[in-house]
From Swiss-Prot:
<protein>
    <recommendedName>
        <fullName>Protein FAM218A</fullName>
    </recommendedName>
</protein>
<feature type="region of interest" description="Disordered">
    <location>
        <begin position="104"/>
        <end position="127"/>
    </location>
</feature>
Length: 157
């Protein structure tokens, strides 16, 4: 059983801006999400996984369904991050299965003024330095980062 990919706010089980339904359908071959297909066998009790410096992660089973809510605790606040719903997946049924647009960019943009060899040689060019904000991948916005901290060989999955 695999999940279906639906972007933010369109999950019928847990509606709201913070509810997600996500699918490993497009990237089930990747190691970090290999085990989500077997996740429906979890008992009805929460699992707390250690997330290192990112707080703790809990995987809760929605009673009566095969829906899993991953929650994380940071500064004692609990927020719903991803809902894994077991439903049949076909390529045409999940139009938003491609998550490439929802994962924040990790590579910093190439900014002008950081290369010593730019411009014609011999001419002094006025250099403008563009300072951008520090680049981080936020743990609350990107889909890929939300499941990134689950241990790969975890017996829970």
């Amino acid at each position: 059983m695999e999940g279906c990919a639906v972007r933010r706010g369109s999950c019928p089980l847990l509606p709201g801006p913070s509810a997600w339904r996500a699918s490993p359908a497009g990237w089930a071959g990747r190691a970090k999400l290999r085990s989500w297909c077997r996740a429906s066998g979890l008992p009805n009790r929460p699992y707390t996984l250690t997330g290192g410096r990112h707080g703790s992660v809990s995987l809760l089973r929605h009673p009566g369904t095969t829906t899993f809510v991953q929650q994380r605790s940071l500064h004692q606040s609990w927020e719903k991050r991803i809902v894994f719903s077991a439903c049949p997946v076909s390529r045409s049924w999940c139009p938003e299965r491609n998550f490439s647009g929802s994962i924040p960019a990790v590579t910093p943009p190439k900014l002008p003024g950081h290369s010593k060899s730019e411009g014609p040689p011999g001419k002094v060019r006025k250099r403008t330095t563009i300072r951008s904000q520090p680049l981080f991948v936020t743990r609350t916005r990107g889909f890929g980062s939300a499941v990134g901290w689950l241990p790969l060989g975890s017996p829970v999955l």
